[in-house]
Amino acid sequence: YAESEGEILKSFMQKWAQHREMVAKMTDIVRENGLFGLQAEEKMMRWMFASREEKSGKLWRAINNDNVLECQTMESNSVDLIVTSIPFSNHYEYTPTYNDFGHNEDNGKFFEQMDYLTPELMRILKPGRLACIHVKDRVLFGNATGDGMPTIDPFSEMTVFHYMKYGFRYFGMITVVTDVVRENNQTYRLGYTEMCKDGSKMGIGCPEYVLLFRKLPSGTSRAYADLPVTKNKSEYSLARWQIDAHASWKSSGNSLLSYEDMKGAGIDKIRHLFRNYEREHIYNYEEHVSFAEELEAYGKLPKTFMAVDPVSKKPWIWDDVTRMRTLNTKQSQKKRQNHICPLQLDIVERLIERYSNKGELVFDPFGGIGTVPYCAINLGRKGLSTELNYDYWKDSLSYLYEAEMEVSAPTLFDLMSDAV
């Protein structure tokens, strides 16, 4: 600043000091007395959900209701498979109602509310069948905890012990790999610049998990389900099962993949070739980093998503889930409200195909915009969902009608056979 602007600077610094003093005083007042006005306004806006609405087709039912109340009316042993993504404690609120599972003070209060739902899920699930629960550990930000750095709340582990408390047998966890670059663009907790300043404060990305719980069958001598989930050997071969179970990958013997081999290709092609190469060769960390650095040197390393993420060879770690393949894509196309935590279609489809038979009933107590029943219909099953948020429930209806029309639409050969 120029010497002639000295008084301006002095005035600015004085005002800035007054501002900081005012902020400090207001912060102390809020800490001591709370935000009474906001709390009162919130209480006036919040209400107890007391209505119920149901729509159905030949292959599905969708109910706008509190899932605890709805499950209490369902028959015992009436559901073949449960696939759901439970709320991540009080991380989000989906409705301004007291019934909302996200409207809780902490994890303890959240699981107290779950204590009313989980026993009902155990009761309505058929013996020997599964409840597949999608969860994710929560990031606790330093400005909220006072630690000054992000830490992780082991929500998935709490969920395991909660379901076991009500008789579910825990027997597996599927890891769904997430894109650490996309995650950082949302949370800013894994920034490269901050890591260079002090790497000791940096953790890792948070994967998602599908927790597998089973209700014991009536007879435990061989532990077959009362109605087993069978596979036709002509459609599901021994060879396929061995590969699925053991992830046995053979190397083709190709030479080391170099960026020079594909520098003219687009990022989609580069990503495809890299993943194929990784699956066929023994993993080498230094080669992985070197390849990514070559991409960066040529200006082809994206900053909005991870182009050369680690590839898994294990069947219980799913690294090929398409993050954008959710019903939110259709929501955006139709200019509707997006779901806060959309469940990927890939995850649901795999669970339904693996753990249910065609024609069976798949239930989602946290139905959202209808992902689970939508996938169930498309895979030859029946779908059932409950959802508290009216807008989400209403949006789900169009997808369920659409799915039923697609699978029920007669083909030309059907019409010809009817004519004959």
Task: Identify the meaning behind each predicted range.
Residues M13-W16, P150-T151, R189-G191, Y401-E404:
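Short, hinge-like loop/turn segments at secondary-structure boundaries
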